[in-house]
Amino acid sequence: MRILGIDPGLRLTGFGLIEQTGQKLAYVASGVVKSGEGSLPARLGILFGGINEVIATYRPDTCAVEIVFVNVNPQSTLLLGQARGAAICAAVSNDLTVAEYTALQIKQAVVGHGKAAKTQVQEMVKRLLALPIAPTADAADALACAITHAHGSRLGAQSTAGYRLKGGRLV
């Protein structure tokens, strides 16, 4: 099964793809979609198009997205939520099932505790996928989200049951 992990952001949205065969995980690709400058609708359109392009290129079977945390600045939280929505819409428009995980769940699944630093997540992603160098922070977070889904489909089935989307509908 090929899993697309997404770490949403308005300026940079990280993506990471892994292939799961039984218990074995293999790295496929990772990177970021940059929205650049411009109006909010234009930037969201770039993110939507970029994730669509990733899906068309790598043909994942399912998608895992990090859930937005509530920031001190409500405006930032709203903008991040819109970027996340653009990524989810891209996945759903390509008939992918979407599972959602909190940052705490991702860190626990990949590092072993929920208060892990970004550098710890990067290092564990590097080790788990046998990469020569650690991926960038955004790509590592996306790969960690995909790894969480692969390792924790049982975790995700319970923790995100009310948030799964298929064909644009909650399942």
From Swiss-Prot:
Q: Which GO terms fall under molecular function for this chain's record? A: crossover junction DNA endonuclease activity; DNA binding; magnesium ion binding
The protein's Enzyme Commission number: 3.1.21.10
Active site: residue positions:
D7, E66, D138
- Give the signal peptide as a residue range, or say none if absent: none
Provide the protein's localization. Answer: Cytoplasm
* Full protein name: Crossover junction endodeoxyribonuclease RuvC
Q: Which UniProt keywords apply?
A: Cytoplasm, DNA damage, DNA recombination, DNA repair, DNA-binding, Endonuclease, Hydrolase, Magnesium, Metal-binding, Nuclease
- The record's free-text note on cofactor binding: Binds 2 Mg(2+) ion per subunit.
PROSITE patterns the UniProt entry points to: RUVC
Assembly and partners are described as:
Homodimer which binds Holliday junction (HJ) DNA. The HJ becomes 2-fold symmetrical on binding to RuvC with unstacked arms; it has a different conformation from HJ DNA in complex with RuvA. In the full resolvosome a probable DNA-RuvA(4)-RuvB(12)-RuvC(2) complex forms which resolves the HJ.
Catalysis performed (reactions): Endonucleolytic cleavage at a junction such as a reciprocal single-stranded crossover between two homologous DNA duplexes (Holliday junction)
Q: What is its main location?
A: cytoplasm
* Binding positions (Mg(2+) 1): D7, D138
Any one annotated GO CC term: cytoplasm
GN (gene name): ruvC
Pfam families, per the entry: RuvC (PF02075)
Q: What processes does the entry annotate via GO biological process terms?
A: DNA recombination; DNA repair
- CDD domains xrefs: RuvC
Q: Enumerate the residues binding Mg(2+) 2.
A: E66
